Amino acid sequence: MSKKKLSKGQQRRVSANHQRRLKHADSKVEWDDSQLSEPQEGVIISRFGMHADVEAPDGKLHRCNIRRTIHSLVTGDRVVWRAGNETLAGISGIVEAVHPRQSVLTRPDYYDGLKPIAANIDQIVIVSAILPELSLNIIDRYLVACETLEIEPLIVLNKIDLLDDEGRAFVEEVMDIYRALHYRVLMMSSHTQQGVAELEAALTGRVSIFAGQSGVGKSSLLNALLYPDDAQILVNDVSDASGLGQHTTTAARLYHFPHGGDVIDSPGVREFGLWHLEPEQVTRGFIEFRDYLGSCKFRDCKHDTDPGCAIRAALERGEIAPERFDNYHRILESMAQVKTRKSFSAPDN
């Protein structure tokens, strides 16, 4: 007999009980100031409830408590922490402060608004593939997210080894749409290793996120780039009915590439939606539209069949790609459909 799927309310209660257990466990470890070393810098490798794994400057990991005055702490945060003179109940230090973030990746939550899930990201690697079909709509969705978050994108088209010469020429022509907008595009194959060296160079010295739909080869790419033992963690599935799973599969985690650079990965990081955005944010997310904003005849122009629309006029002059224009309206339509089914409220600032 299959397990009964938990409702949203039941999942939230399971999560709340889990957090209370972690908080209770945390209260068992009380650090006296005399037991702590001098403050030092660190990076959050992963966060587990009231605890976090901190990487010290020497590369060693320390499971730490988190000061109750710290209200937001995610993977990638740069912190000040203090090591304990001894390990107590598996805890070897405490996080005392968080440095200001250069960037933060957020995910819309149906109940809690925008939730930060990773910090200090330099680029989002948008992984797409030519099979079962090349979806420009998905690429454009992620580009809108990148523009809204103000994080630089890198488009990686995987599985190009499956293309013949004619197919390759067609895909190159399609990708020229994005190159013309000054987006970086990389064609590669994790199977033949074509383009892997170029991708390694693009990742070196940066903190990256890999994003894309299931089946496009994200895990295969990461397996090709990371140490095998680390990469194996990335392909595990979450089987826990509560959706919490194990720490190694559900918590966002930072990995180091052997060639240099880092990646933050988790199932929640790889896929994130746009339904929480306002239409105006989506419009600005199409960077080629920006020069025409404010030039339409009507202030409430929907940039479709409205008379005097500057964006449609640019489309008709060939200054905007029809594929991008069509995807813009598809995104708005899908967002409107989702918002009729979900309720969303942004958190107070």
Swiss-Prot record:
Its EC number is 3.6.1.-. GO terms for biological process: ribosomal small subunit biogenesis. The keyword RNA-binding applies. GO terms for molecular function: GTP binding; GTPase activity; metal ion binding; rRNA binding. It holds the Pfam family RsgA_GTPase. It is found in: Cytoplasm. InterPro entries: G_CP_dom (IPR030378), NA-bd_OB-fold (IPR012340), P-loop_NTPase (IPR027417), Ribosome_biogen_GTPase_RsgA (IPR004881), RsgA_GTPase_dom (IPR010914). One of its GO terms (cellular component) is cytoplasm. Binds 1 zinc ion per subunit. Its main location: cytoplasm. Keywords: Cytoplasm, GTP-binding, Hydrolase, Metal-binding, Nucleotide-binding, Ribosome biogenesis, RNA-binding, rRNA-binding, Zinc. Residues 111-272 form the CP-type G domain. Zn(2+) binds at C296, C301, H303, C309. Belongs to the TRAFAC class YlqF/YawG GTPase family. RsgA subfamily. One of several proteins that assist in the late maturation steps of the functional core of the 30S ribosomal subunit. Helps release RbfA from mature subunits. May play a role in the assembly of ribosomal proteins into the subunit. Circularly permuted GTPase that catalyzes slow GTP hydrolysis, GTPase activity is stimulated by the 30S ribosomal subunit. Monomer. Associates with 30S ribosomal subunit, binds 16S rRNA. NCBIfam families: PRK12288.1, ribosome small subunit-dependent GTPase A. PANTHER family: SMALL RIBOSOMAL SUBUNIT BIOGENESIS GTPASE RSGA (PTHR32120), SMALL RIBOSOMAL SUBUNIT BIOGENESIS GTPASE RSGA 1, MITOCHONDRIAL-RELATED (PTHR32120:SF11). This is Small ribosomal subunit biogenesis GTPase RsgA. It comes from Dickeya dadantii (strain 3937). The lineage of its organism: Bacteria, Pseudomonadati, Pseudomonadota, Gammaproteobacteria, Enterobacterales.
